[in-house]
């Protein structure tokens, strides 16, 4: 147990967690493989997964997240104008997390969620970097 410096799976071949920490996103979160080994532990009600992204400048702070708690998903976006001391915030809850897709790795794939017909949040990793779509 200690610092990891190379990419690895968060769940090992026996379905157990590879303990340790990393200074950057190195873990592949293959929950499908883990769930097939330990169904009782990885039930839909026990898994908590999220993706969070933020940008901070001297004048503006922006943050967005998609959290899936098993029984509920939450979409949140914040924009804080530091100079004017104005906060804009939008939050939506999705019962049972229906339609929420979380990528297995923060540096690959797409994480997205839609609440109703108009609220949409997506994080997409491309060769150019992470793209965020908010509707």
Q: What are the roles of these predicted feature ranges?
A:
Residues 1-135:
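Targeting-peptide/extracellular-domain and disordered-appendage signature
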């Amino acid at each position: 147990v200690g610092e990891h410096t190379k990419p690895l799976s968060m769940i090992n071949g026996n379905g157990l967690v590879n303990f340790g920490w990393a200074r950057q996103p190195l873990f592949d979160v293959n929950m499908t493989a883990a769930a097939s080994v330990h169904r009782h532990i990885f039930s839909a009600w026990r898994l908590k997964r999220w993706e969070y992204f933020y940008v901070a400048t001297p004048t503006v702070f922006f943050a967005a997240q998609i959290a899936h708690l098993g029984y509920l998903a939450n979409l949140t976006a914040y924009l804080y104008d530091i100079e004017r001391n104005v906060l804009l915030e939008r939050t939506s809850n999705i019962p049972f997390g229906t339609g929420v897709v979380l990528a297995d790795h923060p540096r690959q794939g797409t994480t997205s969620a839609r609440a109703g017909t108009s609220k949409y949040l997506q994080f997409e990793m491309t060769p150019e970097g992470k793209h965020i779509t908010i509707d």
